[in-house]
Structure formats: C-alpha cells, structure tokens
C-alpha cells in the first residue's frame, strides 16, 4: 500500500519527490493484484479461525503477528485499488528503486515496471514473499545504497 501511495504522490506532486522507493509492488500497480475483498474481510473478522480464504489468512496472521492496526489496513485496502496507467508511470521522472520479492505472487514484476520509467531500477529480493520482502536485510542495504547514490540536495 505504501508503494501505491508513494507513486501517487510522485504523480500528483512531482516537484516534491527527489527520489522514489517502491517496495513490495511492481507491475501489479498497473494490472492489479487480485481480489482484495476477502483480505479486507479477514483483517476485520472478529475471530481469525473463521477466515477461510488462504491469502486472507496469510494477511491476517501477519497483521496479528506485527500487532498492526487491522481496521486501518482494511480501510487502506478498500480505498487503494485504483490502478495507475503505463503512461502515468512513464511520467515519473524521479530516480526510482523498485523492490519485489522473488517469491511474491502479489506484487507483479518489478523489472517490468522499471522498464516503463525513464530513471528506474528493479531489485529482486531473493527468496522473499510479499510479507517478508520489505523487511529483508538485502533490500534495506539496497535502499541505503540507492539513497547514497541519489542524495537529496
């Protein structure tokens, strides 16, 4: 959700975005990432044992494990489904780093998204799924190196 928000910011106020980092969302920003209604329902279910949707169970378990605000996450899911067009993505001129886990079946291709942008690079977060990719040490190291290479002046 943060990657979608960051991309929207870069499109709406490009003059305010010196560098852009999109973690956990690739081409899915353009072609969608599936049906999120069962995930929102899983996050707001009173009893996690009643959740039957496999992806919903995964998101619910992760939210509970990290003690996240499940209602806030569900609200974000319900309001952040707007897709961004290829033309819009191509208009993002800020240096951009895109990170997607190699086991992420939600995000879509980081490489494919980066190829649309004039100054973007993709980073494969090896062995990580959607839930674990942005917390990965290799991703964090890549982000720090990217920011060092693209200092905000």
Predicted regions and their residues:
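Acidic beta-to-alpha connecting loop that harbors the catalytic carboxylate
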Residues: 101-104, 127-129
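Hydrophobic, aromatic-rich cap/lid helix
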Residues: 60-85
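Short, conserved loop/helix-junction motifs that constitute active-site signature segments
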Residues: 89-93, 115-117
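Short beta-strand/loop motif that positions the catalytic acidic residue
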Residues: 92, 98-100
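Flexible "cap/lid" loop of the alpha/beta hydrolase fold
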Residues: 4-47
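Catalytic active-site module of serine/aspartate enzymes centered on a nucleophile-bearing elbow/loop
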Residues: 123-153
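Conserved alpha/beta-hydrolase "acid-adjacent" motif
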Residues: 104-110
């Amino acid at each position: 959700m943060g990657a979608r928000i960051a991309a929207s910011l870069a499109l709406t106020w490009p003059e305010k975005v010196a560098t852009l980092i999109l973690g956990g969302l690739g081409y899915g920003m353009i072609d969608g990432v599936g049906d999120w209604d069962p995930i929102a329902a899983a996050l707001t279910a009173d009893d996690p044992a009643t959740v039957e949707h496999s992806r919903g169970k995964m998101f619910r378990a992760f939210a509970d494990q990290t003690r996240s605000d499940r209602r806030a996450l569900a609200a974000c899911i319900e309001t952040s489904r707007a897709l961004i067009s290829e033309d819009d993505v191509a208009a993002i001129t800020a240096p951009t780093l895109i990170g997607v886990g190699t086991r992420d079946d939600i995000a879509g291709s980081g490489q494919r998204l980066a190829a649309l942008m004039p100054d973007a690079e993709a980073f494969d977060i090896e062995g990580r799924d959607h839930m674990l990719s942005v917390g990965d040490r290799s991703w964090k190291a890549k982000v720090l190196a990217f920011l060092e290479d693209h200092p905000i002046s």
